[in-house]
Amino acid sequence: MALQQDIIEALGVKPTIDADEEIRISVDFLKSYLKRYPFLKSLVLGISGGQDSTLTGKLCQMAMTELRAESGDSDYQFIAVRLPHGVQADEQDCQDAITFIQPDRVLTVNIKAAVQASEQALREAGITLSDFIRGNEKARERMKVQYSIAGMNAGVVVGTDHAAEAVTGFFTKYGDGGTDINPIFRLNKGQGKRLLNALGCPEHLWLKHPTADLEDDRPGLQDEVALGVTYEMIDRYLQGESIDPAAAKIIEGWYVKTEHKRRTPITVFDDFWKK
């Protein structure tokens, strides 16, 4: 129970939320950051067609629309980036997400050729990637592209990390975890669904089974299968409820194992890894 409380406090999860209030918190958070650094003019986010990027994208667009109206500065823009690896199986969901979000700009960069070129260069150096590591390569290529776009548009890269993902470390280090700002960090999975419902998002985008879809050998592998625990159980844990001890052990095991992912590079002054 002590570790559970430490985790809840570290991730800032509330046991109950008001969806409209949380929407306003996230939008104002994004706006205040850009106001603090007026040389920044854009928010850049990869859109996958899943719950998290759909929610984050909508919040980004709301923030930029309000900033333009409040400041009179038409340079503020939200750039949604489609980053398929070849042909994406749920491409229609991606298009539905774009239709819902209505981004200022939509860019599409297919990462397949870049990933294959990197894999070939490594192969020539004697390194053959496993399917799992190739999946990480895809995630990092996507983030590289987003930073290039942000760099050319006075922008910041927005992340989709939320509490149910952070607690398990279910993201690629310096891939989808390598962002500038994370506006939904404090929310668990179910709370994110509530925000999308309040925003009028099509149900199929937040009722679908979450998948990172990074592995070629296991396409569409559901998050809950990879983690060995359901998001419902993770959400209940993060809300301070007592859950099945076996599920709690899995969640806490992921949390401890992936601590390094939630920190900046380790220095001689860090000691968390010794505990």
From Swiss-Prot:
Pathway of action: Cofactor biosynthesis; NAD(+) biosynthesis; NAD(+) from deamido-NAD(+) (ammonia route): step 1/1
List of residues binding Mg(2+): D52, E165
SUPFAM superfamilies: Adenine nucleotide alpha hydrolases-like
UniProt keyword annotations, A-Z: ATP-binding, Ligase, Magnesium, Metal-binding, NAD, Nucleotide-binding
Binding site for deamido-NAD(+): R140, K173, D180, H260, K261
Database matches in Gene3D superfamilies: HUPs
GO molecular function, one term: ATP binding
Enzyme class: ligase
EC number annotated for this UniProt entry: 6.3.1.5
InterPro entries hit by this protein: NAD/GMP_synthase (IPR022310), NAD_synthase (IPR003694), NH(3)-dep_NAD(+)_synth (IPR022926), Rossmann-like_a/b/a_fold (IPR014729)
Domain of life: Bacteria
Residues given in the record as ATP binding sites: G46, I47, S48, G49, G50, Q51, D52, S53, T160, K189, T211
Example GO biological process: NAD biosynthetic process
Catalytic activity reported: deamido-NAD(+) + NH4(+) + ATP = AMP + diphosphate + NAD(+) + H(+)
Transmembrane residue ranges: none
Quaternary structure and partners: Homodimer.
PANTHER family in alphabetical order: NH 3 /GLUTAMINE-DEPENDENT NAD + SYNTHETASE, NH(3)-DEPENDENT NAD(+) SYNTHETASE
Family statement drawn from the similarity comment of this UniProt entry: Belongs to the NAD synthetase family.
Entry protein name: NH(3)-dependent NAD(+) synthetase
Organism: Erwinia tasmaniensis (strain DSM 17950 / CFBP 7177 / CIP 109463 / NCPPB 4357 / Et1/99)
